[in-house]
Amino acid sequence: MVKIGVLGLQGAVREHVKAIEASGAEAVVVKQVEQLQEIDGLILPGGESTTMRRLIDKYHFMEPLREFARSRKPMFGTCAGMILLANKLIGYEEAHIGAMDITVERNAFGRQKDSFEATLSIKGVGEDFTGVFIRAPYVVDIADDVEVLSMHNGRMVAVKQGPFLAASFHPELTDDYRVTAYFVEMVEEAKMKKVV
């Protein structure tokens, strides 16, 4: 059984833990840098990206998170987590973790009051997935090796690049665990490759 961490500084941590466990993996809430060494994959949950960055800096997580990405262990960023994984952010000088060759626009779907749900088709996951968008970012540009998994109204809302997955929406806020199960499979495959 693979062990998947959820960065536990802010955001929908409990919901991600439930989704991971429902998908047949062990979940760990990561609150200390040392825990990164014990896990096979990591979810960066939604929340407020500037607050999350402040907490990441306060608890000295940034360089260990970049090191985790360099080790090519799978990472999945949802909403604010997508912003953390992007290597370019519209209107900002500096990326955060910068593991994915994507350009992201923050709060692109509007503010909290503009939150909405949309039915999505997600490559590798299936049809009729309810995406919960809360002040959601979206991807405006990608490198050639980034795969677009889902679009909404002509905007890229789920992308994959190697061991990295990012979604504008919150898959953990529904009882449909297919997106989390997709990430669990990515982690299982990556772990098997390391063993071989």
Curated annotation (Swiss-Prot):
Pfam families: SNO. L-glutamine binds at G47, E48, S49, R106, I134, R135. It comes from Bacillus cytotoxicus (strain DSM 22905 / CIP 110041 / 391-98 / NVH 391-98). Its EC number is 4.3.3.6, 3.5.1.2. Coiled coil: none annotated. Belongs to the glutaminase PdxT/SNO family. One of its GO terms (biological process) is glutamine catabolic process. In the presence of PdxS, forms a dodecamer of heterodimers. Only shows activity in the heterodimer. The keyword Hydrolase applies. One of its GO terms (cellular component) is glutaminase complex. Keywords: Glutamine amidotransferase, Hydrolase, Lyase, Pyridoxal phosphate. Catalyzes the hydrolysis of glutamine to glutamate and ammonia as part of the biosynthesis of pyridoxal 5'-phosphate. The resulting ammonia molecule is channeled to the active site of PdxS. InterPro entries: Class_I_gatase-like, PdxT/SNO, PdxT/SNO_CS. This is Pyridoxal 5'-phosphate synthase subunit PdxT. Pathway: Cofactor biosynthesis; pyridoxal 5'-phosphate biosynthesis. It catalyses: aldehydo-D-ribose 5-phosphate + D-glyceraldehyde 3-phosphate + L-glutamine = pyridoxal 5'-phosphate + L-glutamate + phosphate + 3 H2O + H(+); L-glutamine + H2O = L-glutamate + NH4(+). GO terms for molecular function: glutaminase activity; pyridoxal 5'-phosphate synthase (glutamine hydrolysing) activity. The active site is at C79 (nucleophile), H170 (charge relay system), E172 (charge relay system).
